[in-house]
Amino acid sequence: MLTANTIIIDVRTPAEFAEGHVEGSINLDLESGQFEAELPNLDPAQPYIVYCRSGRRSGVAVEIMKASGFTQITDYQTLENAANKTGLPIIE
């Protein structure tokens, strides 16, 4: 669920992110190691929405976050699903 405190994370590559992303999302590429490198800088008490292209990478990211003590995580799987469920536009 989207609140004023929700952080939206796009775990796709920077090239994919540049092609289109949910407004206000941050890009933390799972495959390059950027996601795991930045994880200690994220607040586990905040709510998060995670998405990618197909749901595979976002699912992996959510499992990593859960193992690191994050509890308020929603996996919206795809860019389109994240945009629809949050009501936010896709920025290209």
Residue ranges of model-derived segments:
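Rhodanese-like catalytic fold shared by cysteine-dependent sulfurtransferases
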Residues: 2-7, 14-46, 56-92
